[in-house]
Every structure is written in structure tokens, then in C-alpha cells.
Amino acid sequence: MTRVRISEDALQDLNDGFLFYEAQEVGLGDYFAACLRADIERLKVSAGVHRVVYQDYRRLLSKVFPYGIFYTMEGDCGVVWAVIDLRKDPAWVREKLKE
């Protein structure tokens, strides 16, 4: 099993998504958080198999929400750097990953 670490930026992305969905409907934020948590947990068994989409970043697609989990491999550890709504402009996504 691969270790998974989540960066502060990715945690902020998750919080922003939670707040957005919770504002749409009470309880939807909790559902979003649970789904994305499960998606990130999948990295423990599948990290490294996703294709590289930008520089060294790999992307795991969320099973429920239109989000991508962007991560890199550092040895035997998958590091989640960003959790991004994929409805955003691809140029914006690339700029965010450059940061």
C-alpha cells in the first residue's frame, strides 16, 4: 500500500469545495467531503497508475463530483497537491499547478 500525503493547498481546495456545495444544499457539502475522501483513499492502492497530465502531475478523477485530484509520486508516497473542479478553464488549471 502506498502512503498518501495531502498538501495544505489541497486541503484548502477541499474546504472550498465543501463550502460551495454546502451553500447549494445543506448536507451536500458533507456528501462532497465523504466522496472526495474516499477518492483520495483509493490512491493508497492505485497511486502511480494514473496518466501524467501536466509536468509530473497525475490526475485521479472523482467518481461522483466533477473534480480531479492532482498528485505526484515522491518515492513510495503519493502527494496530493490540488483538488480542482474540472469545469474550470484548462489554462487556469495549468496555472494553479504551476504555483
Give the location of each predicted region.
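Arg/Lys-rich, positively charged N-terminal/basic patches that mediate binding to nucleic acids
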Residues: 1-33
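Short, hydrophobic secondary-structure boundary micro-motifs
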Residues: 30-31, 51-53, 92
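Enriched for short, Lys/Arg-rich terminal
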Residues: 68, 72-99
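Active-site micro-motifs of SAM-dependent methyltransferase domains
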Residues: 12, 42, 88
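Basic/aromatic recognition patch in beta-strand/loop cores that engages polyanionic ligands
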Residues: 38, 42-79
